């Protein structure tokens, strides 16, 4: 079987070129595109200012290529207008977008006006956000799950990210779906009693577990609706529900396997960061503790931590790398700029 990396870094992110390199680089564009929204940010390195633009979804799997590209360009235009600059003044632009076919987004952007832009999968942006674009691992667990890492010699590896039908183990969707399954097993006696049963009826406004099961096939729930139920799973786990806690332990084990695969295939050893990105980690210790234990079983010195900076920060860090000014702004200062800009919108 082919064992080449599923995701690699574009040459421009390993050998910076940029439109305007070095001291001439002032404006960098970063974009974070997902299944629900798109955020563009223009970073003014001279004035230490950030200008944002917002648009709808840009995940091609969710809305198609045409609408995805339109969202990216609409968000960009807003951010450029906020910065009072033209497109040609950008030193670099990095688009981190969710979906299975970022190459299609790349082609369509090149066919419009963005022939110099760098398009990567959102897991690459997440890795950069988590590690400061340095050797280490970024592990996403939001609605879906995905893990990506870069080793000290530049080797890359992705594990997971196969979508909710074939994967997304350890994600909010997985937790929500398995919580409903646990309620079904409680009802038919094939599983232990759990407070997830009553919680599922209230959350999905269903009169019975049987009706909930039937409705899934007649009016399928969206990924977001299923993933949202994981909040209830978290609440019940903290309240001591055994089944809810077991689900988080299973989620940690499955996601931990993917993280271990990334560590093994990138050659990461010793002290390196493993950044946890996504809404599922808001569950706290019921999820993060068993996941950390799973990681430390193979990498005892790894630093495991929840990432606080918004994902668009990773795109901006990669943009600075692309135009040869990596380190012009550290992660802490960038995170503060993003937090302030988001608070004003």
Residue ranges and their predicted role:
Residues 96-194, 331, 342-345:
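Phosphate-binding/catalytic loop of phosphoryl-transfer enzymes
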Residues 37, 92, 144:
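Broad gene-expression machinery/nucleic-acid interaction feature
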Residues 92, 116, 273:
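Residues at the starts of beta-strands that form the adenosine-phosphate
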């Amino acid at each position: 079987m082919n064992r080449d990396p599923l995701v690699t870094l574009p040459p421009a992110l390993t050998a910076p070129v940029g439109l305007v390199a070095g001291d001439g680089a002032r404006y960098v564009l970063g974009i974070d595109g997902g299944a629900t929204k798109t955020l563009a940010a223009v970073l003014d390195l001279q004035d230490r200012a950030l200008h944002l633009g917002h648009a709808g979804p840009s995940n091609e799997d969710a809305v198609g290529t045409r609408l995805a590209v339109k969202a990216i360009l609409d968000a960009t235009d807003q951010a450029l207008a906020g910065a009072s600059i033209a497109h040609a003044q950008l030193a670099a632009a990095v688009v981190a977008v969710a979906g299975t076919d970022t190459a299609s987004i790349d082609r369509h952007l090149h066919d419009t006006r963005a022939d110099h832009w760098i398009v990567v999968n959102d897991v690459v942006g997440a890795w950069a956000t988590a590690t400061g674009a340095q050797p280490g691992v970024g592990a996403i667990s939001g609605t879906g799950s995905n893990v990506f890492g870069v080793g000290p010699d530049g080797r890359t590896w992705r594990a997971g990210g196969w979508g909710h039908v074939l994967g997304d183990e350890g994600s909010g969707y997985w937790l929500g779906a398995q919580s409903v399954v646990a309620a079904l097993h409680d009802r038919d006696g094939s599983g232990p009693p759990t407070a997830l049963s009553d919680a599922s009826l209230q959350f999905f406004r269903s009169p019975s577990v049987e009706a909930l099961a039937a409705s899934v096939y007649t009016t399928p729930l969206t990924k977001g609706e299923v993933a949202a139920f994981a909040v209830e799973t978290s609440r019940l786990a903290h309240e001591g529900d055994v089944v809810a806690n077991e689900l988080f332990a299973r989620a940690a084990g499955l996601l931990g396997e993917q993280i271990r695969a990334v560590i093994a295939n990138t050659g990461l050893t010793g002290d390196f960061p493993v950044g946890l990105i996504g809404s599922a980690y808001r569950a706290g210790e019921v999820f993060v503790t068993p996941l950390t234990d799973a990681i430390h079983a193979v990498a005892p010195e790894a630093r495991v931590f929840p990432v606080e900076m918004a994902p668009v920060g990773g795109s901006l860090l990669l943009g600075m790398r692309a135009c040869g000014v990596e380190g012009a702004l550290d992660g802490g200062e960038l995170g503060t700029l993003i937090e302030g800009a988001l608070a004003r919108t």
